[in-house]
Amino acid sequence: MIANLTGLFLSVLAASAVLPSVIADAKSAKLETTDTMIPSGEPGVELFVRNKHRAGKQAFSADKIVLFVHGATYPAETAFDLPIEGMSMMDLIASRGYDVYLVDVRGYGRSTRPAEMSQPPGANKPIVSTKVAAHDLGAAVDFILKKRHVSKINVMGWSWGTSIAGLYTSENNNRVNRLVLYAPQWIRTEPRAPAAANAPPLGAYRLVSKDSARERWLKGVPEDKKSDLIPPGIFDAWADATWATDPDSSKQNPPMLRAPNGVAEDNANYWTAGKALYDPTKISVPTLILQICQATWRRVILLS
């Protein structure tokens, strides 16, 4: 998955193809990494932002700055900067001369967890809607614009992140240089499954186990293809790093990752109800839409 995402992303930004020489160069590149907690613009809410770039380089043009936003369940840090065989996607892009950032919206990763996430899931209504997440993305964009003295940057969203980035861009074209929507959400045309008669109301957040994550990743994959989809050791490395970003995960047995349900509520109210959450005709910047051709990959991305 990391190699696939990286190759696609670099092509979007007109970088070189991912060849063995590029990989070797990336591994030898000296990179600077900075982790920052930035204000969201709302009292008590801070957002985790990571930045990587070649060591010693501080000046970047707008077309060389990239911000990545995660999907519905897992944080950007382990989606975008998990070292596999000594290198992450973020490392590779930074080694090619880009100023690369990731952001976790509130409720995810190292960003502030809303107070509702310290209560039982069913005690409150769904939290962290796409609109709220787009606000957080905007805070990260503004932070980068000020830091690098530029007027716009490139933005990439993955899965739910495409809705976050799409909504933000539709309202802030002047701050976005280019937009990448990888595995975007859109209006679902298949009939909606009827809700169970005794189904409880959607709570503030959901709990996700490592086993359930693995099962959903591999759902529908032929047995002889599973080892190719997730090479040995990769899932465990990703899961351990991902669950470690939730300070409460280890308090349960098995460990459970908390993920806000605002995205699930938006799915029900918009995408599966035949309505778009944002108006794509209001996006005027160059945009690349990347869709998965294999159904299984689509499941993996949409559940991310």
Walk through the language-model features, giving the residues of each.
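Conserved hydrolase catalytic core segment
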Residues: 151-190
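Short, surface-exposed "cap/lid" segments of acyl-processing enzymes
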Residues: 56-102
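Conserved alpha/beta-hydrolase "acid-adjacent" motif
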Residues: 295-302
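Alpha/beta-hydrolase
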Residues: 190-290
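N-terminal cap/lid segment of alpha/beta-hydrolase-fold proteins
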Residues: 27-61
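Alpha/beta-hydrolase active-site loop
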Residues: 121-147
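Glycine-rich "HGGG/HGxG" loop immediately N-terminal to the catalytic nucleophile
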Residues: 76-77, 103-125
